[in-house]
């Protein structure tokens, strides 16, 4: 599946978007009000784990408003000149500017963004030293949609300039299944509801992962000469992909087993845990831990990470299991 096809499968309206019910309801009100007043939507910050649809929602916002969208990312805007080029050359009245990973925006560029967000003007410095002068460029009234997986890294001045701040939640297996059935229909292959929900249940509550898994399960079905993906085929393919019934892969299980085995279930600091499993701390915090916390398998405490009774149960271990119970790291 190519990138343009991925874009073609995206929902084009709030009505087509499955999940995030509370967010959809609120966003629908904000969009309707903005259209009724013929105003740009307030600047919007969307945050949550990767793959939950922040980019898709940004495109939906633009589509619902009937305006264009300009897509960029925080790391791509290093200097004020980068920002000026986007704001002065790419945007028309009411357009949406989507900045992914906005927490990685350069600090100087961020400070130049403040007057653009508040007063729709951009201050440009011409020349250097005593001869330098500042000119003020008017900008069209636009909507900035920022997306981040790390809201704690958004500075207070930046956060205060967003009129709408919303968190995206993990999806239920049923919500993911509904979306996958739509994808299968658009792509012209069969998928039963039971198989779709099974894929959803092993997708970490994340739509992006579910779509990737659907492609891989479809590969297995195609090789087997099956035109429709049934539950048994989905289960078999997902098992071969190394995903258990909760959607945990080998890295997730290594995290839990290391926490329980090497550190007696915790508490242990994230840096120490990351070193023990040959991973970096940011990857643990951004990729692995959100879902493990969502499942109730670990807790983040002031003293470090702690495995819960649910984690022991999922691994088939008694709470407080000894090293020999895991059969790992033994001589």
Swiss-Prot record:
Chief localization class? Answer: cytoplasm
Annotated compartments: Cytoplasm
The EC class name is hydrolase
Fetch the InterPro entries from UniProt. Answer: AAA+_ATPase, AAA_lid_4, DNA_helicase_Holl-junc_RuvB, P-loop_NTPase, RuvB-like_N, RuvB_C, WH-like_DNA-bd_sf, WH_DNA-bd_sf
Binding positions for Mg(2+) per the UniProt entry: 55
Region entry Large ATPase domain (RuvB-L): which residue ranges?
Answer: 1-171
Gene Ontology biological-process annotations: DNA recombination; DNA repair
Region Small ATPAse domain (RuvB-S): start-end pairs: 172-242
Which protein family is it in? Belongs to the RuvB family.
Q: What the protein does?
A: The RuvA-RuvB-RuvC complex processes Holliday junction (HJ) DNA during genetic recombination and DNA repair, while the RuvA-RuvB complex plays an important role in the rescue of blocked DNA replication forks via replication fork reversal (RFR). RuvA specifically binds to HJ cruciform DNA, conferring on it an open structure. The RuvB hexamer acts as an ATP-dependent pump, pulling dsDNA into and through the RuvAB complex. RuvB forms 2 homohexamers on either side of HJ DNA bound by 1 or 2 RuvA tetramers; 4 subunits per hexamer contact DNA at a time.
> What is the protein's given name?
Holliday junction branch migration complex subunit RuvB
Organism, by scientific name, is Deinococcus geothermalis (strain DSM 11300 / CIP 105573 / AG-3a)
Which gene is this protein's source? ruvB
């Amino acid at each position: 599946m190519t990138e343009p096809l991925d874009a073609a499968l995206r929902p084009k309206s709030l009505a087509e978007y499955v999940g995030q019910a509370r967010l959809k309801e609120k966003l629908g009100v904000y969009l309707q009000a903005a259209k009724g007043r013929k105003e740009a939507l307030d600047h919007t910050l969307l945050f949550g784990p990767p793959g939950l649809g922040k980019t898709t929602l940004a495109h939906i916002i633009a589509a619902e408003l009937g305006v264009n969208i300009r897509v960029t990312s925080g790391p791509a805007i290093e200097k004020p000149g980068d920002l000026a080029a986007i704001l002065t050359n790419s945007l028309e009245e009411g357009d949406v500017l989507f900045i992914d990973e906005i927490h990685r925006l350069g600090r100087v560029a961020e400070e130049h963004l403040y007057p653009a967000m508040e007063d729709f003007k951009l201050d440009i410095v011409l020349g250097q030293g005593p001869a330098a002068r500042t000119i003020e460029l008017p900008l069209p009234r636009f909507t900035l949609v920022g997306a981040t997986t790390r809201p704690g890294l958004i500075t207070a001045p930046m956060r205060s300039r967003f009129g709408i701040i919303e968190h995206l939640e993990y999806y239920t297996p049923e919500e993911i299944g509904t979306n996958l059935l739509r994808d299968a229909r658009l792509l012209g292959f069969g998928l039963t509801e039971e198989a779709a929900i099974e894929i959803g249940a092993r997708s970490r509550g994340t739509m992006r992962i579910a779509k990737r898994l659907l492609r891989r399960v479809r590969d297995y079905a195609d090789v087997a000469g099956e035109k429709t993906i049934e539950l048994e085929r989905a289960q078999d393919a997902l098992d071969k992909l190394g995903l258990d019934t909760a959607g945990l892969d080998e890295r997730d299980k290594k995290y839990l087993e290391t926490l329980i085995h090497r550190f007696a279930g915790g508490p242990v600091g994230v840096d120490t845990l990351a070193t023990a499993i040959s991973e970096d701390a940011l990857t643990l915090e951004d990729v692995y831990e959100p879902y493990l916390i969502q499942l109730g398998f670990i807790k983040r405490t002031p003293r470090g990470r702690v495995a819960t009774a649910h984690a022991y149960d999922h691994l088939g271990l008694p709470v407080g299991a000894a090293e020999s119970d895991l059969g790992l790291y033994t001589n």
